């Protein structure tokens, strides 16, 4: 297998974008929506190929997370997927590690939302499960997002976070987290 490639969305060919969508659809089934795919675009992609076949992917996009009265420049991880036949071989960790320098040098916070199944990967990579509340800045104001509580991982690059204060994500279509 080749090393992990890093490419901005603008550098990807239509075939690359189609391969990302196909991989994510296979990994997540009906839970991966058009909005989820859209969320993964506009930033950098970590891509792992086996020959010409995309077998692992993770995207890092810029977002603003409000916390303690500040709008934190956040590298938000999206669309982490590994082909079913090569799972548990370190490919998810490889694409995540490839994004680490971009988070460390480009943002004050790294964040991601995950399922229970994905949580062990992020914990093993040094991400911290956010213990505090979550919310979203919606068109109707700040609204709690209790469904996201317990499923957000963070990597604080630019200082400590106060778990007594909520993490408030910016608004977007589909799942806000």
Where are the regions that the model predicts?
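A conserved beta-strand-loop-helix scaffold within acyl/acetyltransferase catalytic domains
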Residues: 6-81
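Conserved active-site tyrosine of GNAT-family acetyltransferases
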Residues: 20, 122, 127
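Acidic/histidine-enriched, glycine/proline-rich intrinsically disordered or flexible terminal extensions
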Residues: 143-177
């Amino acid at each position: 297998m080749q090393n992990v490639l890093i490419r901005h969305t603008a550098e990807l060919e239509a075939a690359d974008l189609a391969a990302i969508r196909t991989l994510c659809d296979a990994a997540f089934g009906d839970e991966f929506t058009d909005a989820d795919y859209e969320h993964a675009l506009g930033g950098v992609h970590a891509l792992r190929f086996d020959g010409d076949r995309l077998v692992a992917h993770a995207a890092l996009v810029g977002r603003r997370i409000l916390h303690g009265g500040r709008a934190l420049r956040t590298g938000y991880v999206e669309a982490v997927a590994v082909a079913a036949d090569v799972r548990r071989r370190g490919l998810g960790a490889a694409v995540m590690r490839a994004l680490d320098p971009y988070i460390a040098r480009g943002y004050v916070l790294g964040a991601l939302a995950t399922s229970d199944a994905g949580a062990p990967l992020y914990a093993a990579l040094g991400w911290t499960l956010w213990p505090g509340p979550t919310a979203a800045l919606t068109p109707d104001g700040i609204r709690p997002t209790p469904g996201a509580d317990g499923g957000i991982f963070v990597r604080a690059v630019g200082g400590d976070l106060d778990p007594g204060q909520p993490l408030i994500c910016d608004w977007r279509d589909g799942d806000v987290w």
